[in-house]
Every structure is written in structure tokens, then in C-alpha cells.
Amino acid sequence: FFETIDGDATYGRLHSIISSVASIEEIAICEISKSGGTLETKLLSEYIGSTLEKILKKKPLRIVITGKWSQLEQSALLSNDIVFHLEEMVGGRFSVFSHVGLVPLYLGGYNIELLLQGASSAIEEFVLSPYTHAVSREALWIIDWLSHGRNWYLNFFFDISSVHIGRWFVQLFAESFGKENNPTYLFPVSATGTMDLHSIAQSVYAQSHPWLIEWLRCIPQEDNDVFREARDALYHGALQAAIDQWIPCRKTFIRRSEYDIAQWMQQKMMVIMLLSAICEVDAFDQPLVEMYKSR
């Protein structure tokens, strides 16, 4: 996944991919931009496509996911590329179970049927018992502590493979809840254990008053983690240290599977919807960060 314009990193990863394939037929470029005008995506796609064609002597398969009638759609159709559409009503941060998330994950070898089953189960379980569901409990827990001035919400993942999920969590909460007219602003933070224990955790323990934390432990499906016992001890130690500082904490355990991760992500989206409804904030409108594109 190429997600930022960094020349050295992009060059290194791209040439690593090229050296690992026998022909261009093993490569597909999946370009995602709802507006079709995102500068980073456009530059990356052009650079990757031209580099592959130059070295492997043939254009790679290109798959485009974009909004209808965008410039990207028009250029893709003219080039006979494969095109998937993202509906106008679906915002980027809520698009993980649309073509935006499912197509690249399928290309990457993930089981998207299990992803959809996990997401669907979260919705079905909430509909059956909305007042006692984990989604409702988390939303009310956050609202309660917001009223006490705790507005820094940290999701601390004790699993290095969860770093990208953590970034998605931050974007989801920041763009959905971080609005000018929201007096109960919640500042989302993601950290990864054990790396961030001596950085973010230090700040949390030292300045405990604004924080509330969800401690997440991702459990491998196969019990072959040689460091599991040590990581479990560090997880529980870090959690207990936060409790000793009177920081409100939640514990969450997730199996490292498509089903469980999708279920957790869908629950987070539902939490945001409940929070936004309670605080009368529009979670779906365009965030102010889009201003940079016109500057």
C-alpha cells in the first residue's frame, strides 16, 4: 500500500516489488480517489505506472476506484482501465466496507467475505439489543468522561500489525467528531505497544487528567507467537499503571482475523454515529482539512 509521497520510500518499495515478480502480469495498480483530484494519489499512480512500464516494458493492469463523473473516472475509461464507483454519500473514512476497502484487500489476498460477515454481525447484534450493546456502552462511557473534561481518547494497540487500523481510528474520530461547532471536542490518539510506552504512555501517566484509554490486544489465530507471554505481561503492566493513575480504561481483545477486525471497525463507526447524534454533530459532512487542496 502506497499512501504518501515519499521519494526514497516509494522508490525502495517499488523496486522491491519489481525484483520479486517474473512479469508485469503479476502486478495490478489500484488507484483510489473519491474526488479524482487528490494530488498525492495522482502523483503516486503516475510515477508507479511509468516506472513499471519503463522497466517491465508493458503497462500494468490499472484498477480505479473513484466517484462518478470525476476526472479520474473519465481518464480511466478512455484508457480502458477497470473502474469501480464510490457512491457520493459514502465518505472516505466510512468506506472501508465499500469498493474502496474491499477491492484492494481482495487483491492483497484477504478474505473479504469474512470481513463483510464481521461487519454485518456488529450491526445485527446492535439492532437486537441496542441499549446493552458494546457500542452503546462505549459511546456513553465516552460522553460521561467528556463531561468530566477527559477529551483525549487513546487507543493503545499492543500489536505492531495494527498500526494502520490505529491510523484509521484517528481519522474516523477526528474527521467525524472534530467540528468547529462541537463544544465537546474529542481528540483521538493511536499508539502501538510496546514501542510507544516510553513516549505516549509517559505523557499519559504524567498528565493523566485529560485521558481515557482503550487498551487493545490483538490475539494471533495460531498460537505461534514466541513473545506472547512477554507481551501479555507488558500489556497488563501498562494497563495497571494507567489504572493506578486513576485514568479511565477499557480492555478489548481481538482475534487477528478478518471477521473480528471488521467487527471492531464497524462498531467504531457506530460509536461515532451515536456520539454525533447525542452531541448534535454532523459526522458525515466534509471536514475542514479539505481546505489544503485549494491553497
Please state what every model-predicted region is.
Residues 1, 13-14, 110-114, 124-253:
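Acidic catalytic cores of enzymes that act on phosphate-bearing nucleotides/polynucleotides
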Residues 1-129:
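Glycine-rich phosphate-binding loops that contact phosphosugars or nucleotide phosphates
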Residues 9-12, 89-95, 194-198, 256-262:
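A short acidic, often aromatic-flanked loop/helix-cap motif at beta-alpha or helix-coil junctions
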Residues 32-38, 90, 104-110, 160-161, ...:
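A generic structural motif
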Residues 78-83, 245-248, 258:
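Active-site regions of enzymes building and remodeling cell-envelope glycoconjugates
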Residues 260-274:
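Short glycine/proline-rich, acidic loop/turn segments that cap or connect secondary-structure elements
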Residues 282-295:
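C-terminal amphipathic alpha-helical interaction region
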